[in-house]
UniProtKB/Swiss-Prot annotation:
Name of the protein in question: Glucose-6-phosphate isomerase
Subcellular location: Cytoplasm
GO BP annotation list: gluconeogenesis; glucose 6-phosphate metabolic process; glycolytic process
Catalytic activity: alpha-D-glucose 6-phosphate = beta-D-fructose 6-phosphate
PROSITE patterns xrefs: P_GLUCOSE_ISOMERASE_2, P_GLUCOSE_ISOMERASE_3
Organism lineage string: Bacteria, Bacillati, Cyanobacteriota, Cyanophyceae, Gomontiellales
Principal location class: cytoplasm
Gene Ontology CC entries for this record: cytosol
GO molecular function: carbohydrate derivative binding; glucose-6-phosphate isomerase activity; monosaccharide binding
Pathway per the UniProt entry: Carbohydrate biosynthesis; gluconeogenesis; Carbohydrate degradation; glycolysis; D-glyceraldehyde 3-phosphate and glycerone phosphate from D-glucose: step 2/4
Amino acid sequence: MDATALWQRYLEWLYYHPELGIYLDVSRMRFDSAFVETLAPQFAKAFADMAALEAGAIANPDEHRQVGHYWLRAPEIAPTEELKTEIVETLEQIETFAAKVHHGQIHPTRGGLFTDIISVGIGGSALGPQFVSQSLAPERPPLDIHFLDNTDPDGIDRVLNRVEPRLSTTLVIIISKSGGTPETRNGMLEVEKRFKDAGLNFAEHAVAITSYGSKLAQIAESAGWLAIFPMHDWVGGRTSELSAVGLLPAALQGIPIREMLHGAKLMDEATRVPDLKTNPAALLALSWYCAGEGKGKKDMVVLPYKDSLQLFSRYLQQLVMESLGKEKDLQGQVVHQGIAVYGNKGTTDQHAYVQQLREGLNNFFLTFIEVLQDRQGASVEVEPGITSGDYLSGLLLGTRQALYEKQRDSITLTLPQVTPLTVGALIALYERTVGLYGFLINVNAYHQPGVEAGKKAAAANLALQKQLLRILSQEPQPISLMTLAAKVGAPEQTETIYLLLRHLAANGRGVSLQGPPEQPDRLLVRATA
């Protein structure tokens, strides 16, 4: 397609949101009008399914749950007065709590103001808050935030050691819907121990975000924590950023949360329009479907050309892959759906993997995210008439052109600035796109059975570890792995048994391995004191 035809295609498919100042360009995706026509019935059904979801239908049939994250920024559309009241009151409680912390009405036991936050959560309870913090937190926030988003002991120590000098003025937020998420529970216990060792009462620094009546809620209530905020069963972790999960940490950092909610609400209104060409989420869903033939055949590369949006690709990775990566469709047929997502930031990635994108396997489509405003204030000219921001813009446009010349498809999403309004809109845009695409390919985008399978396998391995230690404590002499596996009645799990014991031995945990490390089948195992 020549330059004139491309310009006409750009004009035909360009979307612009006047209140948000957001542009969406899908002209470099290679679909035609005939292809769009074939999808018209599927889009009509997807629009109807989305309307039913917002009206309170059971949109997560596997867990028999409603899906209500859209109600969070428009309580008036919640299906009951009770839900509407709960949403409004929770937002007010978040704002009141943050204001009291900022003004010292809620303060550390030893006086003064809280200076830091440790946020303990995993998955959606971490990725959204991390993305929003990096993109929107002021340079000097009222509280600095630190995240414990894994059960890695070394990683936990790094965060706690960094905060140690200010532990007495640190607020801790524990985020877990059930209260039983092992990684979050482990983080909570590690932090609690550090507070105890410092002579501090953990409860006087702790806040819970959890579901009503959960294990975590019971712990927080009985210990007298500072506050408990709700996690609703109709909000999934990966769509929870505009619930208490994301709004409380944001408010404590001084981020205007109502502006985020307003941006999301404006985008929700735009993406409710049941017309493909004037609905930005539908345009994105169409592009995804076209790129991967509705089967996820191509990866999604996300390149924000703005440092403050660097974590957006990680946030999208969970939102897209956990929602759409499904073995079966809604009728139980095996389909193996999904879209792989990766990315970092431009122009950094132009010096990393863009070489392969242009000249290697054509197994992807790319989303450029452009921000029009370079910075607050004027820029230095690095060449006559040219600024650093001009280079950033020029490199984006150049990469887009270079990829298109090699038959590589791309989408360009343009924001006027990175603000609470546009970040809220960005979150809402992709939440809706994932929902529409899920309906197009007929999968449940709101559950995650694969994650649960991994949790069950991990629990079984830890139970096996306890059994191994018990048997070894009764053995007077070293025994072989095969013998030990037979004694626990699991000869088929010899490899797992070896890997568990190797980890215990490396950490001095009551086990020693004798023999050549490169030949595990010849090792002898014994208990140590």
